[in-house]
UniProtKB/Swiss-Prot annotation:
Gene: opn4b
Segments of skewed composition (Basic residues): 469-478
Protein's membrane topology: Multi-pass membrane protein
Disulfide cysteine pairs (residue numbers): C91-C169
Stated role: Photoreceptor implicated in non-image-forming responses to light.
UniProt subcellular location: Cell membrane
Annotated region (Disordered), positions in chain: 390-420, 465-502
CDD domains associated with the record: 7tmA_Melanopsin (cd15336)
Source organism: Gadus morhua (Atlantic cod)
Pfam family, one: 7tm_1
Protein name: Melanopsin-B
Segments on the Cytoplasmic side according to the record's topology features: 41-56, 115-136, 211-244, 301-615
N6-(retinylidene)lysine modified-residue sites: K287
Length: 615
C-alpha cells in the first residue's frame, strides 16, 4: 500500500477532534436518514402528492437518504478509531457513493430550477414539456450524468483517497498531477459553478417576471376588477413556490461552497497551506446538506405536514389548525374557487358578482416545487402556469341574461340552491399541473380562434332555450352545412366574426375597442356589439380534438348538465377516472334535453384553446 497516498495513516490531532467530528456526523446521519425517510413515506402514502413536479422532490429525498445512510455510519466509525479502517476498496466505494449522491442532488436542483423557470416565464412551452414521462426522463438523465462523473476516478481519471483527518474519502484534489488537476477543474465547473450560474439566471428571470406581473396588475387598476383576485392569488402562489425551491437551493449551495473553495485552493497549488481541519470541516458541512430539506418541507409544505401527522401518530403536532370554510370552500388549495370576488358600491345599491377564478396555494411545485396536490374539497384543478393571465385584463361581460343572474343580494347568495348556485365544472386532471397562458405580447392566433369563453355556472336551462344557437342539434347541423370549419359554439348572441377582432388579442386597447361593433356573419343578421360575443365555448368535436392532441389530459362530459356534474364523487374525480355520462350519474328529470352537454369554465376554456391552437 502506498503510504504516501494516505491509507492507514493517522493525522496528528487531538483525540477529542475526532470525537467532535464523530458526534456531528452521527447527528447528520440520524437526522438525514429519518427526515428523508419521512419525506419518501409521505409521498408514498399520499397519492395526491405524486405529481410530476413532485417527482423531483422525491428524487432529491432519495439521493439525500442514500447520501446519509452510506456516508455517516462509515465516517462515524472511522472517527472513533481515528483512522480509515476499511481499506482501499472500501475507500473507493465510500467516495464513489458520496460523489454519486452529492452530484445527483446538485443536478437535481438544477432540474428543479429549470422546471420552475419554464412554468413561470414560458407557460405555453410548459404545457408541452411538463409531464410525468418527461419528468422521469429528466430524472434518469440526472442520474446518468452523475454516474459518469462518479465513475471517472475508478476508471483512471484521478483517484479516490482519504482526506481531512483520514477518516473520510474523496477524489484526489491534493496531488498535483495533470489528471487530478484536470478532473478537479472540470468537476467544479460542470457540477458546481455552471449549474449554479444557470440556477441564478433562472431565479433572476422568475423574480423579474413575478415583479413585472405585480406591477401590471397595479397599472391596470380597475380594468381587471373581476380577474384581479385570481391574478393576485396565482402570483402569490407562484412566488411562494419559487421561494420554497430557492430556499432549498440556497441551503444546498451554502453547504457545498466551502468544499468547492478548498478543492480550488488545492488545485491552484496551495494545498500545502490547507490544514487537516480545513479539509475535514468542509467535508462534514457538505454531507450535512442531506438533512436540511425535510425541515424546509415541515415548515413550508402544509400537505407534507398533514400527511405525516395523519400517518405518524407521534408527529400529530405538525397538523395545521382547521381553517374557516366559506360557502365555496375558497380556502382549499389547487381548486376552482367559486366565490364572491367583487363588490361594487353605488349610490343606489350593492351588487355581488360571481366569477369563476382559479386558485392555487402553497405546495409543491414543488412545483416542485409544485408541492401542492389536489385538495379533497370541491372540484379540483391544478394551475401552476398562470402568470400569463395578466395578458387578459379585459373585464368579461356576458349577455344580459347572464348579467341579470349575477346580481343578487348577499342573503340570497348564501341560500343559493343547486339550480341557482353551481360550482364551475372540472375540466382538467389535477395531476397535470398546468393552466397554460400566452406570453405578452400575445402570439398570433390561427383563424377561427376565439379568445373568450362563457362562465357556464350562470347559464340556466331557460337561457339555453332562449338562444337557439346553443342547441346541440343546431350546432351539429351547422357543422353539416357551409360552416364545417367552425370548431366552436356560441352561447350568446355573438358570432364567429368577432373572434378575430383586435380587442380579443390587444390588451392595451381592449376597453376602447370593445365599444366598436363587429361585421355581420352567417349566424347574425345584424351588427353585434363586441361585448355580446364574449361567450364562446368548445363544441364536443373541438373538445375531443384537443383531448386527442394533448394526450388525453382533459376530462370532457358530452352529456348531462351542471346538476350531473355536482353529483360526481370528489374522490372519483381526483383519481382522474373518466367522467361518466348522465345515465351513470342517476340524473333524473332535472336534466333538460337542451342542456345535454357540459363545458369548460370561463378562464380554463379560453386558455386551453389558445394553447392548443399555438401548438
Amino acid at each position: 500500500m502506498d503510504m504516501d497516498r494516505g491509507f492507514y495513516r493517522k493525522v496528528d490531532v487531538p483525540d477529542h477532534a475526532h470525537y467532535v467530528i464523530a458526534f456531528f456526523v452521527l447527528i447528520i446521519g440520524v437526522v438525514g436518514v429519518t427526515g428523508n425517510a419521512l419525506v419518501m413515506y409521505a409521498f408514498l402514502c399520499n397519492k395526491k402528492l405524486r405529481t410530476p413536479p413532485n417527482y423531483f422532490i422525491m428524487n432529491l429525498a432519495v439521493s439525500d437518504f442514500l447520501m446519509a445512510i452510506t456516508q455517516s455510519p462509515i465516517f462515524f466509525i472511522n472517527s472513533l478509531f481515528k483512522e480509515w479502517i476499511f481499506g482501499e476498496t472500501g475507500c473507493r466505494m465510500y467516495a464513489f457513493c458520496g460523489a454519486l449522491f452529492g452530484i445527483t442532488s446538485m443536478i437535481n436542483l438544477l432540474a428543479i430550477s429549470l422546471d420552475r423557470y419554464i412554468v413561470i416565464t414560458k407557460p405555453p412551452q410548459a404545457i408541452r414539456w411538463v409531464s410525468g414521462r418527461r419528468t422521469m426522463v429528466v430524472i434518469l438523465l440526472v442520474w446518468l450524468y452523475s454516474l459518469a462523473w462518479s465513475l471517472a476516478p475508478l476508471l483512471g481519471w484521478s483517484s479516490y483517497i482519504p482526506e481531512g483527518l483520514m477518516t473520510s474519502c474523496t477524489w484526489d484534489y491534493v496531488t498535483s498531477t495533470p489528471a487530478n488537476k484536470g478532473y478537479t477543474l472540470m468537476l467544479c465547473c460542470f457540477v458546481f459553478f455552471i449549474p449554479l450560474g444557470i440556477i441564478s439566471y433562472c431565479y433572476l428571470c422568475m423574480f423579474l417576471a413575478i415583479r413585472s406581473a405585480g406591477r401590471e396588475i397595479e397599472r391596470l387598476g380597475t380594468q381587471v376588477r373581476k380577474s384581479t383576485l385570481m391574478q393576485q392569488q396565482t402570483i402569490k402562489t407562484e412566488w411562494k413556490l419559487t421561494k420554497v425551491a430557492f430556499v432549498v437551493i440556497i441551503v444546498y449551495v451554502h453547504s457545498w461552497s466551502p468544499y468547492a473553495c478548498v478543492t480550488l485552493i488545492a488545485w491552484a497549488g496551495y494545498g500545502s497551506h490547507l490544514s487537516p481541519y480545513s479539509k475535514a470541516v468542509p467535508a462534514v458541512i457538505a454531507k450535512a446538506s442531506a438533512i436540511y430539506n425535510p425541515f424546509i418541507y415541515a415548515i413550508i409544505h402544509s400537505k407534507y405536514r398533514d400527511t405525516l401527522a395523519e400517518h405518524v401518530p407521534c408527529l400529530y403536532f405538525l397538523r395545521q389548525p382547521p381553517r374557516k370554510v366559506s360557502m365555496s370552500r375558497a380556502q382549499s388549495e389547487c381548486s376552482f374557487r367559486d366565490s364572491m370576488v367583487s363588490r361594487q358600491s353605488s349610490a343606489s345599491k350593492t351588487k355581488f358578482h360571481r366569477v369563476s377564478s382559479t386558485s392555487t396555494a402553497d405546495t409543491q411545485v414543488w412545483s416542485d416545487v409544485e408541492l401542492d396536490p389536489m385538495n379533497h374539497e370541491g372540484q379540483s384543478l391544478r394551475t401552476s402556469h398562470s402568470l400569463g393571465v395578466l395578458g387578459r385584463s379585459k373585464e368579461h361581460r356576458g349577455p344580459p341574461a347572464q348579467q341579470n343572474r349575477q346580481t343578487r343580494s348577499s342573503d340570497t347568495l348564501e341560500q343559493a340552491t343547486v339550480a341557482d348556485w353551481r360550482p364551475p365544472l372540472t375540466a382538467l386532471r389535477c395531476d397535470r399541473n398546468f393552466l397554460p397562458q400566452p406570453t405578452h405580447p400575445p402570439y398570433k392566433m390561427a383563424a377561427a380562434t376565439p379568445l373568450q369563453a362563457t362562465t357556464v355556472d350562470n347559464v340556466t336551462p331557460e337561457h339555453w332555450n332562449k338562444h337557439p344557437n346553443n342547441n346541440h342539434k343546431n350546432h351539429n347541423n351547422r357543422h353539416n352545412g357551409n360552416n364545417n370549419n367552425e370548431e366552436h359554439e356560441y352561447s350568446g348572441k355573438g358570432g364567429r366574426h368577432c373572434q378575430n377582432h383586435p380587442h380579443h388579442i390587444d390588451v392595451k386597447n381592449s376597453i376602447s375597442n370593445c365599444k366598436k361593433t363587429c361585421e355581420k356573419d352567417t349566424f347574425s343578421k345584424e351588427p353585434v356589439p363586441c361585448n355580446a360575443a364574449d361567450d364562446v365555448r368548445f363544441s364536443p368535436r373541438s373538445a375531443h380534438t384537443i383531448q386527442h392532441a394533448m394526450g388525453t389530459p382533459f376530462r370532457y362530459m358530452p352529456e348531462g348538465d351542471i346538476a350531473c356534474q355536482e353529483r360526481l364523487s370528489t374522490d372519483r374525480s381526483q383519481r382522474g377516472d373518466p367522467l361518466p355520462d348522465s345515465k351513470s350519474l342517476n340524473c333524473t328529470g332535472d336534466v333538460p334535453v337542451s342542456a345535454q352537454r357540459c363545458s369548460f369554465p370561463h378562464e380554463t376554456s379560453r386558455n386551453l384553446e389558445e394553447s392548443f391552437m399555438a401548438l
